[in-house]
Curated annotation (Swiss-Prot):
GO cellular component terms listed in the entry, alphabetical order: extracellular region
Official protein name in the record: Calcitonin gene-related peptide 1
Family, per entry: Belongs to the calcitonin family.
PROSITE patterns on file: CALCITONIN (PS00258)
Cited Pfam families: Calc_CGRP_IAPP
Gene designation per UniProt: CALCA
Disulphide connectivity of cysteines: 2-7
GO molecular function, one term: hormone activity
Organism of provenance: Sus scrofa
Main subcellular localisation: secreted
GO biological process: adenylate cyclase-activating G protein-coupled receptor signaling pathway; calcitonin gene-related peptide receptor signaling pathway
Amino acid sequence: SCNTATCVTHRLAGLLSRSGGMVKSNFVPTDVGSEAF
């Protein structure tokens, strides 16, 4: 439904954040998580 590059980029970013958000948070911890390592 969206043809502009910006719209496609945002849609891809949204899909990645939803599908890989949990996995990324485990391997790329936040400030609190990084202190544990």
